[in-house]
Swiss-Prot record:
Its cofactor is [2Fe-2S] cluster; FAD. One of its GO terms (molecular function) is electron transfer activity. The gene is nqrF. Its main location: membrane. This is Na(+)-translocating NADH-quinone reductase subunit F. It is found in: Cell inner membrane. Belongs to the NqrF family. Composed of six subunits; NqrA, NqrB, NqrC, NqrD, NqrE and NqrF.
Length: 407
């Protein structure tokens, strides 16, 4: 009798616990459809299955929120305002969102789980973002580790971007061998030196990454990007190579690529202040877009200078275009500094790091550097050095504009 009673009690306990688990699950995960109200506008309302992240849910419904890191929670770009239904803010969001913004409902769409009916607010410009399937026109080396990817927009379509803007590229699952990359002979010695052709990029999940445009709005029908290959750091040689850069470097003319955009916030101020552009590496992209836009589309009369740092002449590109701009526009000057010129360069120009060259040859004797606008994009070390120099010169934050994508 005691055995039977024990079995009955055990069964009852299991049933009660199962019921509690199911009840809790029903509270935590909505298995049916939920409704997401956007900007209190009925025509923007979304009905969708619960369970995915808000970023993916919006994308699946044709609303593309910027996410430079592809939804990993590291870039902080996918900010939205959640009025109801988002739950508590997560620790992964707190490094990107201030307490004041969090109190106002600011969240990262890639971290918010869609579990229940929600009310959110999105900037109106997001609804102008579209997706296109483009064709690769060319994908040529411009420097040892930088390719210029040129894409053709579908006929009849326009990407309405502003200079300094960016697009997102979709990276499909792939297996890419670096040995199959098309690297011209003039650049192969460094690739062999660092044994880079041994790497293989294998990706099983699709992802997104953001890249700034190198073309300016008047160069219609194309998207032009500068993409640096992201190899493992020397101290961690067995780490996987960059997902997106490996994919982009493998592309060949005729291949199809899906992009979305335009996005952006690294835009030129509409003032008469002097503009000083500072770039390095693949940070060339937004510099070219901005400077070409100012001089060729807007015909700006503002005083403009461009200071670009490279290792050697082999790493220089677009320099002939900028030299021509300088000849055609007396208000524009172009300056190059090589940090490690090769003997065959026969270089007689500036040498050293670009922030030092800019200071020693221009800003040190500038009557009012605090009145200039500084636009920069380059490797993180360069950006940090330039910002420190500008702060020491008394330049306010509002006049220091940084694009974090191009380094």
């Amino acid at each position: 009798m005691e055995i039977i009673l024990g079995v009955v009690m055990f069964t009852l306990i299991v049933l009660v616990l199962s019921g509690l688990i199911l009840a809790a699950r029903s509270k935590l995960v909505n298995a049916g459809d939920v409704v997401i109200e956007i900007n209190n506008e009925a025509d923007k309302q979304i009905r969708t299955p619960a369970g995915d992240k808000l970023l993916n849910t919006l994308s699946s419904n044709g609303i593309f929120v910027s996410s430079a890191c592809g939804g990993g929670g590291s870039c902080g770009q996918c900010r939205v305002t959640v009025k109801e239904g988002g739950g508590d803010i997560l620790p992964t969001e707190l490094s990107h969102i201030t307490k004041r913004d969090a109190k106002a409902g600011c969240r990262l769409a890639c971290q918010v789980a869609v579990k229940q009916n929600m009310k959110i607010e999105l900037p109106e410009e997001i609804f102008g973002v579209k997706k296109w399937e483009c064709e690769v026109i060319s994908n040529d080396n411009k420097a040892t580790f930088i390719k210029e990817l040129k894409l053709r927009i579908p006929e009849g379509e326009v990407v309405p971007f502003r200079a300094g803007g960016y697009i997102q590229i979709e990276c499909p699952p792939h297996k890419v061998a670096y040995a199959d990359f098309d690297v011209p002979d003039e650049y192969r010695s460094d690739w062999d030196k660092f044994n880079l052709f041994r790497y293989v990029s294998e990706v099983k999940e699709p992802t997104l990454r953001a890249y700034s445009m190198a073309n300016y709005p008047e160069e219609k029908g194309i998207i032009m990007l500068n993409v640096r290959i992201a190899t493992p750091p020397p101290k961690v040689p067995d780490a996987p190579p960059g997902i997106m850069s490996s994919y982009i470097w493998s592309l060949k003319p005729g291949d199809k690529v899906t992009i979305s955009g335009p996005f952006g916030e690294f835009f030129a101020k509409e003032t008469d202040a002097e503009m000083v552009f500072i770039g390095g590496g693949a940070g060339m992209a937004p510099m070219r877009s901005h400077i070409f836009d100012q001089l060729k589309r807007l015909h700006s009369t503002r005083k403009i200078s461009f200071w670009y740092g490279a290792r050697s002449l082999r790493e220089m590109f677009y320099d002939e275009e900028f030299e021509q701009l300088a000849r055609d526009n007396p208000n524009f000057t172009f300056h190059v500094a090589l940090s490690d010129p090769l003997p065959e360069d026969n270089w007689t120009g500036h040498t050293g790091f670009i922030h030092n060259v800019l200071y020693e040859n221009y800003l040190r004797d500038h009557p009012a550097p605090e009145d200039c606008e500084f636009y920069m994009c380059g490797p993180p070390v360069m950006n940090a050095a330039v910002i420190k120099m500008l702060k020491d010169l008394g330049v306010e934050d509002e006049n220091i504009l940084l694009d974090d994508f191009g380094g």
